[in-house]
Amino acid sequence: MIALDHLRHVNVEAARTARARYRAGTVEPTSGIAPGFTQANMIVLPRDWAFDFLLYAQRNPRACPVLDVSDPGSHTTLLAPGADLRKDLPLYRVWRDGKLAEETTDATAAWGEHPDLVSFLIGCSFTFETPMVEAGIEIRHITDRSNVPMYLTNKACRPAGRLRGNMVVSMRPIPASRVADAATISGRFPAVHGAPVHVGAPEEIGIKDLAKPEFGDPVRIEPGEIPVFWACGVTPQAAVMASGVPFAITHAPGHMFITNIPDSAYHA
């Protein structure tokens, strides 16, 4: 966990403004929004499942790097004082018995079904996109104003308690000459997935067609570019599906919680 005291004087207006827009009903992928602020995936579970997930995350830190865990029944986080986790993401998913039951812009009603929900905020690779762009590496889904493509792989996560599932990865096409740079830059952010888990050869990790991601939108891959894959915080949603979790609330893939924490706080 990062030390928060020295961050109290950071100007967080961009992050607050984005969250206010989402609370008012704006729906959009958050890649490229409030650049410079850490974004987080989210999964919310009844207390009975919280330890299983905490153990799952501990055993699979590349895919599930935990940034914060709430107290049971709380809908707040120290990563953004004053924010409401029920309302301040652009889009939520509600899961019942391992199946997607609904998507909503306000999770208050679903949240009220269980008095003891525990929220987990998980590092997101959007956090290191800003330094990659600053280094001159194009991020295609930002250029095209689309969602990042995400794929379910054949890479099994370590099970924990009642939870099991395979890793989900995000993909960014990178010019061959810049792959090492992309790996170096992202590798400096181990708390938000870190360096790539796979480069090229998508079939080796069970991806049959890059044009058909399980989550998000497909993106163009230009000549001379290589698909580069990072562990992804949608992995918990794959575990919800594979494990038949009775109830969960998550972010919708690509629609993150924007924190008040600067990206630089997670720079190793």
From Swiss-Prot:
Ranges annotated as spanning the membrane: none
UniProt keyword annotation of Lyase present: yes
Alphabetical list of InterPro entries matching this protein: D-Glu_cyclase, Putative_hydro-lyase, UPF0317
UniProt-listed Enzyme Commission number(s): 4.2.1.-
Alphabetical keyword list: Lyase
Family per similarity comment: Belongs to the D-glutamate cyclase family.
Protein name in the entry: Putative hydro-lyase Arad_8587
The organism of origin for this protein: Rhizobium rhizogenes (strain K84 / ATCC BAA-868) (Agrobacterium radiobacter)
